[in-house]
Amino acid sequence: MSDPQTSMAATAAVSPSDYLQPAASTTQDSQPSPLALLAATCSKIGPPAVEAAVTPPAPPQPTPRKLVPIKPAPLPLSPSKNSFGILSSKGNILQIQGSQLSTSYPGGQLVFAIQNPTVVNKGTRSNTSIQYQAVPQIQASSPQTIQVQPSLTNQIQIIPGTNQAIITPSPSSHKPVPIKPAPVQKSSTTTTPAQSGANVVKLTGGGGNVTLTLPVNNLVNTSDPGAATQLLTESPPAPLSKTNKKARKKSLPAAQPPVAVAEQVETVLIETTADNIIQAGNNLLIVQSPGGGQPAVVQQVQVVPPKAEQQQVVQIPQQALRVVQAASATLPTVPQKPSQNFQIQAAEPSPTQVYIRTPSGEVQTVLVQDSPPATAATASTTTCSSPASRAAHLSGTSKKHSAAILRKERPLPKIAPAGSIISLNAAQLAAAAQAMQTININGVQVQGVPVTITNTGGQQQLTVQNVSGNNLTISGLSPTQIQLQMEQALAGETQPGEKRRRMACTCPNCKDGDKRSGEQGKKKHVCHIPDCGKTFRKTSLLRAHVRLHTGERPFVCNWFFCGKRFTRSDELQRHARTHTGDKRFECAQCQKRFMRSDHLTKHYKTHLVTKNL
């Protein structure tokens, strides 16, 4: 071990491993193997006696072969004599201290501990960012506090902290504007405890706008409260001075990777004036002052940063919100028009002849004539009253001009358009004849337009027209139709209380039926509608059948909100039982009642079937 060259040339019997090199490998003289250099370096450790004492007896070793001498690479001068250097395959030199070597491992192998080199993380900032180290300054005037709410993807909204507002703008915000920090003064090297954890950014006053935008990913929060906060802004690469390089070297080792905290808030002091406008992202906040040296007032609004796949929630505190004091325009009050009352002075109306036709077929002619009212009416209306009060309001009724057709079924004196009852008030019609302004029918007021009242069948029942003269025209049917109906009514006029006799059929289409010798045959009543030819035994049946062809349904149900029409009277009577619930047909065996006789007959058959079983 006295000569290093001879010791490395000798056979190193450390262990039967890959550290040995055969003598035939002459091509590696120019480039020594790293394993060979490691074996040569390890051969310098301690005297052989120590290794023999520690190393346990090994199995018989194979015959060693001669190694080619390898020239070690030159090692740099080390301040310690116990340090060793290892040349890697890439040409790097690793220094190993003597205290890191251990020869007590069994098997004669060498174990040494190599500490991992310190890796400097350079990925905490972007390539195009410039690092500014802003030193806190002493500010004489009272500044406004602004809170910055960092977010993962969005930018930061900065709002003067009179009410401590935090707003996070939408992700689609414009590119941040670089911030130029205030120049560092010599007096700012000594920081005060009151401003050790905050930066001061001064915005120039005046009437111009001030735009301040901070990217979220450029905020670094240090754990040391006394350390200066680092502000990173995106800007084009610029040459760095020596002072900035020194400041970076000092700040990088002390900087720690930022912790992902959702509610982390950094306070920045911004000195603003009354005319400043602060804008961040797509949001705009205008700070105005009413003047006179009064401080600006800002509304307090807090915006919760949105989470993943959630909508942004805006929360307004329950405290009293102070609104920005500014000149506000008072909206003029809308003048309301006073209610107008129409004063109507009715003159002596002329007699009016009214034709009223009920659904049962009755046609009445009424002569209406009223005396002028004592006082003027405040509003002219046409209202609906009950049919019982119709006779009280109508005057001048003459029996000579009235005709009624009495039938077996009960009369239906009511007019039921859409199920409602309509009657005429003669006094109000007389007032409406002079100046008709409003017509009130079933709660619906119509001004200045003619009103036509129809029933559910579509037939015209009553027409009220606004005429220019002093007369009010009320008519339900055309004059020709009224004349025809009056003739039919007068032809069948009978006295009240008399029974209607059955009249013989005089229809030319009707012919005698088959009769035997010596017997009077029955006449057949044939339907004269083309392509029909049906025959009936009774004229009533023929008339009811003809109504099916013509679509005439003279029998109307007078029940409230019903108004159904039928071609035969028995159909109307049968339908009326559905409203009254009358069940006049009773079963003799089980006392079950039915509305219709055919239903009772069908039910009686069930008893016959059970009896036969």
From Swiss-Prot:
UniProt feature, compositional bias: Low complexity: 374-392
InterPro entries: Znf_C2H2_sf, Znf_C2H2_type
UniProt motif 9aaTAD: location: 361-369
Subcellular location: Nucleus
UniProt GO molecular function: DNA-binding transcription factor activity, RNA polymerase II-specific; RNA polymerase II cis-regulatory region sequence-specific DNA binding; zinc ion binding
Sequence positions bearing Phosphoserine: S78
Record keywords: Activator, DNA-binding, Metal-binding, Nucleus, Phosphoprotein, Repeat, Transcription, Transcription regulation, Zinc, Zinc-finger
Gene3D superfamilies, alphabetized: Classic Zinc Finger
SMART domains (alphabetical): ZnF_C2H2
Gene Ontology cellular-component terms listed: nucleus
Keyword Thylakoid: no
Spans annotated as Disordered: 1-32, 170-197, 225-255, 374-402
Record field: compositional bias (Polar residues): 23-32, 185-197
ZnF bounds (C2H2-type): 525-549, 555-579, 585-607
GO BP terms, alphabetized: regulation of transcription by RNA polymerase II
Domain notes: The 9aaTAD motif is a transactivation domain present in a large number of yeast and animal transcription factors. In SP2, the motif is inactive.
Annotated function: Binds to GC box promoters elements and selectively activates mRNA synthesis from genes that contain functional recognition sites.
Family label: Belongs to the Sp1 C2H2-type zinc-finger protein family.
UniProt protein name: Transcription factor Sp2
Organism: Bos taurus (Bovine)
Lineage: Eukaryota, Metazoa, Chordata, Craniata, Vertebrata
Gene: SP2
